[in-house]
Swiss-Prot record:
This is NPC intracellular cholesterol transporter 1 homolog 1. The lineage of its organism: Eukaryota, Metazoa, Ecdysozoa, Nematoda, Chromadorea. Involved in the uptake or utilization of cholesterol. Ncr-1 and ncr-2 act redundantly to prevent dauer larva formation under favorable growth conditions, and are required for the normal functioning of ADF, ASI and ASG neurons. Residues 1-20 form the signal peptide. It catalyses: cholesterol(in) = cholesterol(out). It is found in: Membrane. Residues 627-800 form the SSD domain. It is a multi-pass membrane protein. Disulfide bonds join 22-76, 28-39, 65-111, 77-115, 99-246, 102-167, 182-187, 235-251, 464-474, 526-541, 929-934, 976-1046, 977-1005, 988-1002. Belongs to the patched family.
Length: 1383
């Protein structure tokens, strides 16, 4: 933690003098307790003197400067100088010691400068100052009258560049070691030398050293002795006998890149190209040409030769048609079986509607009580990730071993001001008043308090995270840490004397004059070196929590440096290891958010942005409540449209109340309630089995199920209305026959479509994505229950309402009744379906669509469109923009925008090793450590490589490797791990026992490792702890806080990084680093980050070659894991859906293979068209869009099955004519019914504030509806016209092709034969209606002849309806039916 201090103390060793070869010698000027200026040896060079071998510093000189101790051991430094030099070189080992060669070169630099007997050859004094007497201190060199203040140190470029080359790739804490020794990024040799030569007494650097570089090639031979040019050691070579060379990861990054190949081929694939053209594009072009050729051939064949029509003519010529094969007979049997049973159900309901009603009520009574167990999941993770998913399983393992990661609370301040024109810190936020406000905010947050359910007060101190232990403050990552949280430090002033030479120094940032901006000088120093213990301003940069504040964590920027920061970030960490801690944290966060919202309204100086861990959940709930009005309006339109569009409205007998006779207001409203009840039943059943939906999924489910139910309601009611046109008058007593006929015509299609819808939904329920799974399961069961309720409760209601209509009674006014029922019927039957939509489809759309050229052109357009959508669909992206879940005005949306724009740090990621390993064994340690002697492809080296290749791995920042720190902490040369001599089992901490750190009271732990001491010193076993010592001191390491004496203490970084078994062994451990900055609005960043992290974890697992499992975990992974597999899962499910739908339609419609194939073609095309439009409108594939694709299956099935059923029931002979009649009769029902209902209610969602609603439930759902309608009403009929099946009743009866009453929605032959047996022989199943059946009751009634003549006359001449007519209609008049015109 104290790298800079440790390194800079090294430079306090640059003091000496001599006469013959020394120009400075001894200590003369005391600046601080650890910084002494060396003595000037006047004008006479002083010869070096022999070093005393008995002095304790001699052994250290042998260790660090052995090249100087040869022969007579004459040096230019005194023993006291050498002692200070070696102590500080030893501390510099913490930073550079990972590469022994680098460290040796660095030691040579300062050994030569301080102690070389040839010092006068390459060191010159530039500035000296008179010695000032200090009490208690006597200069070591008595003749000296001045001390050295500035020197010039001449180096050869060979040594300087060789030293820099050996050190440039050395890492410290996962980052380049030179980064803490150099203010520029990247660090260059010149900048490095200038920085380490800068004078700073507060950092114990007593003199200013100017490095001058000389090129040996360009320097004359006579001058080559004027610069220091000792031999350097390359990083790939051993510096000393017994020392290892630097590891490849610390020496040659280019070579190391060839050793470690992270890509295992599972995260990227090669793109197929032929001469630069994508293979997919080539394929679709060929497919288009082939499809176009097939279409033209088929069009030619079917326009010149109609097999069905020829067979009909042959049959009419007396030729006997071939006997149906077994498949056709089976299909006919299925067809008749379903119609007959449907008719029986309808007739039973017509006779006894109460029984059906009570059966439906029994279903409700069985299902609805389960609602008492109903609850919605409000956990955001549960909404997006399955508990069985890999990320959630790994999260459970991680939490079980290390506890939950801390909760984050964030505040961001942005300045209204512009950049400053001058100054060290010129960013808009570097104003004193802004930092004063920041301190006020922090103090207010610390005073936030709330109470739990027991009345106990909860403050930040009760919930915050303290990495250094109870004796330290909460971890609040903020620039206030640079001032130790003390606002008064902003008023500090500097009055220090000038200590720097007159020459300007680019690295001396601090002014020595008294200034009110001294706080800014101090902050600038902390931004450059955040781990500095003491800046020139006299303050530490360390926070009161015990650690540094990295500039990229506390300052936001959109430039290349933090001096230009335009935002300030404050991050507060809160613990959540246990459920009580989570509850306390959430209570405090609630008050925290309340404070922030209030403060935002009254912060004129800054732009205030914030969020807490619970913010996302809270805002989703709040925004959902705000959108209730929008959803209610949409549902109100849905209910209103269904209620009023089912009926017919015209006045009879000049009575205004008669307008409600043919209305269906109550039936429409109750049908919607039935749909609602079916949803409740689904909820109840699944709740009983413990399957609970995610938040707000039920609203979507109710919406979808209601829309599908509306389709069935319209088909039943409109089918009845159409049949009334072609039926003679039937009395109320014949209601069972009417209902039976309606059920026979609609229930088979209803059953088929419902089964197909439920199947497509249930297939979606097999996914592990909770949002899709729960929606699909609930919707699938609701669809089936809705069918049951339609066949029971709705059917009973339909019977009662039909009886009311047949009796001429208006809704809501039951005492009233139309007297002339027959007169009302004769006009009403004409206006039953002859609306504008019916006429438009019957006379305009259907003939035009079935025209030969129209079909061919439409087919070509369809194929071209399909091919285009395939290409566009291949480019669709996956993901979800988090900001879309909130309104534009939400404080989270604002905060997300600022994070994207200014914040430069990604989320943490933990590489976890799960499994019990023998960590005490050196061979296992070598698989994880990174210093010399460890494997080049060790776990730690791979991690360092991954962190260093950010663009490939999306990893960045420091890598926390506990095994490295522990082995450094317990090593023989480390001052960290010591035990008492009198009690070797008692740990002697550097924090608790400052007076006992000498060898007399405490000695290193390894001195008492008798097992390790039994090995030779050259053996690795000698330098590594034995099993007993390893595990005994591991817990001491985890409790040891880092300090200036020992930077390797593990409490701050590794306290929660290791999980132990009951035997004290390591069960699991984690190695933390960070992702690079990930764009919140670009989910592909998060997806790639997760994929690459897992790629790295797979490589790490191979590196340890053991039974342990390695996985990467981050809090973001459960949210984004779905996107790695959503495309193959969705594709598989849609494929299964298509296959299943084909089978269901084929079987339930009487083995209609051709019709099912046409429906499947439309289904597949519909998928591609929706996905293509998603690409055009920039809507990625995610759980919401996937849900829309599943819904599109249900909607298109509902439409298609009715079209196929109408086509199969048509009595026309040619395929084109059957398709035309289907469009004319089914088209207006579908378009005016479910399509208008869906589209109309969806349009109201466009006014929602939530982008998630406007995009996924307005824009995308509208695309789904329109695409499904186009495929069902245009594409499917055209496909059927090219070659659909003939149905199961078309060959049994030969009729006139032009008889429109025998189109798709007329009675089937079986239905007609059944009704022909009805009492009084009202229907005798003629090909044309017999007028006598209509006129007979009129002729027998009083005045009936006149009325009949009036009606016939009116309908022939098309005049305006006279006032004498019993019924007047508001609807436009249409042509009279053929049977009436024949009168």
């Amino acid at each position: 933690m104290k790298q800079l201090l440790i390194f800079c103390l090294l430079f306090g060793s640059i003091f000496h003098h001599g006469d013959a070869g020394c120009i400075m010698r001894g200590l003369c000027q005391k600046h601080t307790e650890n910084a002494y200026g060396p003595c000037v040896t006047n004008d006479t060079n002083v010869e070096p003197t022999a070093f005393d071998k008995t002095h304790p510093a001699y052994e250290k000189m042998v260790e660090f400067c052995p090249h100087l101790l040869t022969g007579d051991n004459k040096l230019c430094c005194t023993p006291s100088q050498a002692e200070g030099l070696t102590k500080q070189i030893a501390q510099a080992r913490h930073i550079l010691g990972r590469c022994p060669s680098c460290f040796d070169n660095f030691a040579k630099l300062w050994c030569e400068f301080t102690c070389s007997p040839n010092q006068q050859d390459f060191v010159s004094i530039s500035e000296m100052k008179p010695i000032e007497k200090k009490e208690g201190f006597t200069p070591e060199y008595q003749p000296a009258e001045a001390y050295v203040n500035t020197v010039e140190y001449r180096l050869s470029t060979d040594f300087a560049e060789g030293m820099f080359s050996s050190c440039k790739d050395v890492t410290f804490g996962g980052q380049p070691a030179l980064r803490v020794m150099c203010t520029s990024t990247p660090c260059t040799l010149t900048n490095w030398l200038e920085f380490i030569g800068t004078q700073n007494l507060d950092l114990n650097i007593p003199i200013h050293t100017k490095f001058l570089l000389y090129d040996p090639i360009k320097t004359p031979p006579s001058d080559r002795s004027t610069y220091m040019n000792v031999n350097f050691t390359g990083c790939d070579k051993s510096a000393r006998v017994g020392w290892p060379a630097c590891s490849t990861s610390e020496c040659n990054k280019e070579e190391y890149a060839n050793l470690i190949d992270l890509d295992d081929g599972k995260t990227s694939g090669q793109t197929c190209n032929v001469h630069g053209i994508a293979c997919l594009n080539i394929f679709v072009m060929l497919a288009f040409i082939g499809s176009l050729a097939v279409l033209l051939c088929v069009g030619f064949v079917f326009t010149s030769y109609d097999e069905d029509y020829t067979n009909l003519r042959q049959t009419q010529s007396g030729e006997e048609s071939p006997k149906r094969n077994r498949i056709k007979r089976t299909g006919a049997w299925i067809h008749n079986f379903m119609e007959n049973n449907a008719r029986d159900i309808g007739m039973m309901a017509g006779r006894n509607p109460k029984s059906h009603f009570f059966i439906g009520c029994a279903v409700l009574i069985f299902c609805l009580p389960g609602m008492i167990y109903h609850k919605e999941s409000t956990n955001v993770v549960d909404m997006w990730s399955s508990p069985r998913s890999r990320a959630r399983q790994e999260e459970m393992v991680f939490n079980a071993n290390f506890g939950r990661p801390q909760r984050y609370q964030q505040i961001m301040l942005l300045s209204h001001r512009d950049f400053q024109s001058s100054g060290k810190l010129y960013g808009p936020v570097f104003h004193k008043d802004i930092f004063e406000e920041l301190f006020d905010i922090l103090n207010a947050i610390k005073n936030i308090s709330t109470q739990d359910s027991d009345g106990r007060t909860i403050t930040l101190d009760d919930v915050c995270y303290r990495p250094m232990g109870p004796g330290y403050d909460c971890l609040i990552m903020s620039p206030t840490n640079y001032f130790q949280g003390n606002k008064e430090h902003l008023d500090m002033k500097s009055n220090k004397e000038e200590t720097v030479s007159e020459d300007d120094d680019a690295f001396d940032y601090f002014s020595s004059e008294a200034t009110t901006d001294e706080w800014m000088n101090h902050m600038a120093a902390c931004i450059d070196q955040p781990m500095s213990q003491k800046t020139k301003s006299g303050l530490s940069c360390m926070g009161t929590y015990g650690g540094p504040s990295a500039p990229n964590m506390v300052f936001g920027k959109n430039s290349t440096n933090h001096q230009a920061a335009n935002s300030i970030m404050m991050t507060i960490l809160v613990t959540q290891r246990t459920e009580p801690e989570i509850q306390k944290a959430e209570l405090w966060e609630k008050e925290f958010l309340k404070f922030c919202k209030e403060y935002r309204e009254k912060s004129p100086k800054v732009i205030f942005s914030f969020m807490a861990e619970r913010s996302i959940t809270d805002e989703i709930e709040n925004d959902a409540k705000d959108e209730i009005v929008t959803v209610v309006i949409a549902l109100a339109f849905l209910i209103g449209y269904v209620t009023f569009s089912l009926g017919r409205y015209f006045v009879c007998e000049n009575q205004l109340w008669s307008i409600l006779v043919h209305s269906r207001i109550c039936l429409g409203m109750l049908s919607v309630i039935i749909n609602l009840l079916s949803s409740f039943c689904s909820w109840g059943i699944f709740s009983m089995f413990g399957i609970h939906p995610v938040k707000n999924a039920l609203v979507v489910q109710f919406f979808v199920v209601t829309l599908l139910g509306v389709c069935r309601t319209f088909m039943v009611v409109k089918y009845y209305a159409q049949q009334r046109v072609s039926m003679p008058y039937m009395s109320p007593d014949q209601c069972p026959e009417i209902v039976g006929m309606v059920m026979a015509g609609t229930m088979p299609a209803m059953f088929s479509s419902s089964l197909g819808c439920a199947f497509s939904f249930f297939i979606g329920g097999f996914t592990d994505l909770p949002a899709i799974r729960t929606f699909c399961l609930y919707a699938g069961l609701a669809v089936l229950i809705d069918v049951v309720l339609h066949c029971t409760i709705f059917l009973a209601l339909f019977v009662w309402d039909t009886q009311r209509e047949l009796n001429g009674k208006p809704e809501f006014f039951f005492p009233y009744q139309i007297k002339d029922l027959l007169g009302a019927y004769l006009i009403g039957r004409q206006r039953a379906t002859d609306t504008f939509m019916t006429q438009f489809f019957h006379f305009q759309v259907a003939p035009f669509l079935m025209h030969r050229m129209t079909r061919i052109i439409t087919g070509i357009i369809f194929i071209a469109s399909f091919i285009t959508t395939v290409i566009l669909s291949s480019k669709i992206s996956v993901g979800f923009d988090q900001s879309m879940a909130f309104t534009e005005k939400s404080y989270i949306s604002t905060h997300f925008r600022y994070l994207d724009k200014f914040f430069d740090v990604g989320p943490p990621v933990f590489f976890t090793v799960d499994g019990e390993l023998d960590w005490h064994r050196p061979d296992v340690q070598n698989k994880f450590c990174t210093f010399p002697g460890c494997s080049d492809t060790s776990f730690g080296n791979i991690m360092n490589y991954a962190v260093g290749h950010t663009e490939q791995t999306y990893l960045s920042g420091e890598m926390y490797n506990w095994i490295d720190n522990y082995l450094e902490w317990i090593s023989r040369k480390s001052p960290c791990c010591k035990v008492y001599v009198h009690d070797p089992n008692t740990f002697c901490s550097t924090n608790r026992n400052k007076s006992a750190l000498d060898d007399k009271a405490c000695r290193t732990c390894m001195d008492f490792d008798y097992v390790a001491n039994s090995y030779p010193k050259s053996s690795i076993m000698y330098h590594r702890p034995s099993i007993e010592v390893f595990y005994r001191h591991l817990r001491h390491f985890l409790e040891d806080t880092p300090n200036s004496e020992c930077v390797f203490g593990g409490r701050a970084s590794f306290k929660d990084a290791i999980s132990f078994t009951s035997r004290g062994r390591i069960q699991a451990s984690q190695f933390m680093t960070f992702h690079k900055k990930l764009s919140i609005s670009n989910s592909s960043d998060f997806i790639k980050a997760m994929d690459t992290a897992r790629m790295v974890s797979r490589r790490l697992e191979r590196s340890i070659d053991d039974t342990a499992h390695v996985f990467a975990y981050s809090k973001i992974f459960p949210f984004y894991e779905q996107y790695s597999t959503i495309m193959p899962i969705l594709t598989t499910q849609l494929f299964i859906t298509v296959v299943g739908v084909f089978g269901i339609i084929c079987v339930t419609l009487g083995i209609d293979v051709k019709g099912a194939a046409c429906a499947v073609i439309c289904q597949v095309s519909n998928y591609f068209h929706i996905v293509a439009f998603m690409y055009i409108f920039n809507i990625p594939v995610n759980a919401l869009s996937a849900t829309n694709l599943v819904m599109s299956s249900g909607i298109l099935i509902e439409f298609s099955v009715n079209v196929l059923k109408g086509y199969a029931c048509s009595l026309r002979q040619r395929a084109k004519d059957r398709a035309e009649s289907t469009v004319g009769s089914i088209g207006p029902i579908i378009l005016s019914g479910p399509v208008v209902t869906m589209a109309g209610s969806t349009m109201f969602l466009s006014g929602a504030h939530l982008q998630i609603i406007t995009v996924y439930f307005f824009k995308l759902f509208l695309i789904t509806i329109v695409s499904s309608a186009v495929h069902a009403l245009i594409i499917l009929p055209i496909l059927l016209a090219f070659g659909g099946s003939r149905g199961h009743g078309s060959s049994e009866t030969s009729t006139n092709d032009n008889d429109e009453q025998h189109d798709a929605c007329v009675l089937s032959p079986t239905a007609e034969s059944h009704i022909s047996n009805v009492e009084e022989g009202i229907l005798n199943r003629p090909s044309l209606l017999d007028a006598s059946h209509i006129l007979d009751p009129l002729l027998k009634a009083e005045g009936g002849i006149d009325k009949a003549i009036d009606i016939i006359t009116i309908d022939r001449s098309y005049p305006s309806t006279p006032s004498s007519l019993p019924c007047t209609s508001r609807m436009p008049r249409a042509h009279i039916e053929p049977d009436l015109r024949s009168l």
